[in-house]
Amino acid sequence: MSSPSKRREMDLMKLMMSDYKVDMINDGMHEFFVHFHGPKDSIYQGGVWKVRVELTEAYPYKSPSIGFTNKIYHPNVDEMSGSVCLDVINQTWSPMFDLVNIFEVFLPQLLLYPNPSDPLNGEAASLMMRDKNAYENKVKEYCERYAKPEDISPEEEEEESDEELSDAEGYDSGDEAIMGHADP
């Protein structure tokens, strides 16, 4: 396992063979989406988020960049950008960690044990410290509004349908141009 590119391929394959749905962006192995489910027995249970992952050329020596694409209410996640404030990923990353660790350990731990003293979402941190019940209700409301399976899948299906339609239309008009119109 000498080169970062081999390690990147191995880690990505391991992630794809796990229980996570992975959607590649473009043709490279540097950017992809992972469908992440909220941890069981938590206020995030039932939520499904599409997490964008970007691997640098230096991966696994440098941490991947991760961010939620659909909204999540959490003190350590920026509500607008989806950026994650996660010490393990941002500061203490080590090549011994892999992509599966992010989705099986780091993100579930972040959701289960938020750190309101180091917030990216000050409103969520403040509400969590002031009124835990109101905070939990708001998390559940966000899960209902923004983190259902249909919130992360339909646009992909629509894009595929549109592409299939344009491919079919292009094929038909191309045939007519080459062969001409049939004689009546």
Swiss-Prot record:
<protein>
    <recommendedName>
        <fullName>Ubiquitin-conjugating enzyme E2-23 kDa</fullName>
        <ecNumber>2.3.2.23</ecNumber>
    </recommendedName>
</protein>
<dbReference type="GO" id="GO:0061631">
    <property type="term" value="F:ubiquitin conjugating enzyme activity"/>
</dbReference>
<dbReference type="InterPro" id="IPR016135">
    <property type="entry name" value="UBQ-conjugating_enzyme/RWD"/>
</dbReference>
<keyword id="KW-0067">ATP-binding</keyword>
<dbReference type="GO" id="GO:0000209">
    <property type="term" value="P:protein polyubiquitination"/>
</dbReference>
<feature type="compositionally biased region" description="Acidic residues">
    <location>
        <begin position="152"/>
        <end position="175"/>
    </location>
</feature>
<feature type="active site" description="Glycyl thioester intermediate">
    <location>
        <position position="85"/>
    </location>
</feature>
<dbReference type="InterPro" id="IPR000608">
    <property type="entry name" value="UBQ-conjugat_E2_core"/>
</dbReference>
<dbReference type="GO" id="GO:0005524">
    <property type="term" value="F:ATP binding"/>
</dbReference>
<dbReference type="InterPro" id="IPR023313">
    <property type="entry name" value="UBQ-conjugating_AS"/>
</dbReference>
<dbReference type="GO" id="GO:0005634">
    <property type="term" value="C:nucleus"/>
</dbReference>
<keyword id="KW-0808">Transferase</keyword>
<comment type="similarity">
    <text>Belongs to the ubiquitin-conjugating enzyme family.</text>
</comment>
<feature type="domain" description="UBC core">
    <location>
        <begin position="1"/>
        <end position="148"/>
    </location>
</feature>
<comment type="pathway">
    <text>Protein modification; protein ubiquitination.</text>
</comment>
<feature type="region of interest" description="Disordered">
    <location>
        <begin position="146"/>
        <end position="184"/>
    </location>
</feature>
<keyword id="KW-0547">Nucleotide-binding</keyword>
<comment type="function">
    <text>Catalyzes the covalent attachment of ubiquitin to other proteins.</text>
</comment>
<dbReference type="GO" id="GO:0006511">
    <property type="term" value="P:ubiquitin-dependent protein catabolic process"/>
</dbReference>
<keyword id="KW-0833">Ubl conjugation pathway</keyword>
<dbReference type="Pfam" id="PF00179">
    <property type="entry name" value="UQ_con"/>
</dbReference>
